[in-house]
Amino acid sequence: MAATSDESMPPLKQQATPEGWPGGDGMVAASILAEFGAETIKVEPPDGDPLRFVAPEEIGVAGTGLPFLSEARNRRFVTLDADDPAGWGVFRRLALSADVIVTTKTPERMEAMGCDYLSLREERPGIVYLSLSTYGAFGPDASRSVQDSDILCQALSGGPCIVGEPEGDGPPMPHQSPTRLGNWHGWFVQGLWGGFGALAALHFRAETGK
């Protein structure tokens, strides 16, 4: 049966998603929303997202590496200075017009910018706020200033021990030592679950009005 215009519309056609200075996990989560039709705006620092310049085997286009080209697909792009209050104001205006926020900045940083969940919810009660962090939003490590990275995600998950746990007696062979999983495994898994969580929250909001 041929689809009508309404039936062929992407599920998230009417959703807007600013993606605030995220790492690889944020890009993966936002990519899921974009694939479902959300208008997704990626916010980058003035010099560009550092992940633009990651190019294994020097594979890329016009100075942008293949991983970024893949995971930042289906986006609009804007540059903002996170250290400039004027940039905070622009991001806040974007956030207040959005349905979903995706960020990997620490809760303290977002609060200082006036873009934390509680602040935004006061003006936009139905907003879905996806905050991704290796250290979480609460607990003793939440405010750690160490830069978030895929290898930290993997190490804290315990995943590398599955790949290279030493076997038998004596010193381990190189291939038996705990080993980083290939690609951005930590970021991919975190981003996938984050994206699915945002979709679930949008569904809940649509069903309950909350």
Predicted regions, residues:
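Alpha-helix N-cap/helix-initiation motif
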Residues: 22, 83, 183-187
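Glycine-rich nucleotide phosphate-binding loop and flanking beta-alpha elements
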Residues: 24, 47, 86, 108-110, ...
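Glycine-rich phosphate-binding loop and adjoining beta1-alpha1-beta2 segment
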Residues: 35-77
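Conserved small-residue-rich beta-alpha loop and adjacent elements
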Residues: 9-48, 55
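Active-site-adjacent "lid/gating" segments in soluble enzymes
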Residues: 32-36, 97, 111-210
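A structured beta-alpha segment of the ubiquitous adenosine-cofactor-binding alpha/beta core
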Residues: 18-21, 63-122
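Basic/polar N-terminal segments that are highly enriched at the extreme N-terminus
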Residues: 1-10
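Hydrophobic alpha-helical segments in the ANL/AMP-binding
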Residues: 28-31, 65-69, 195
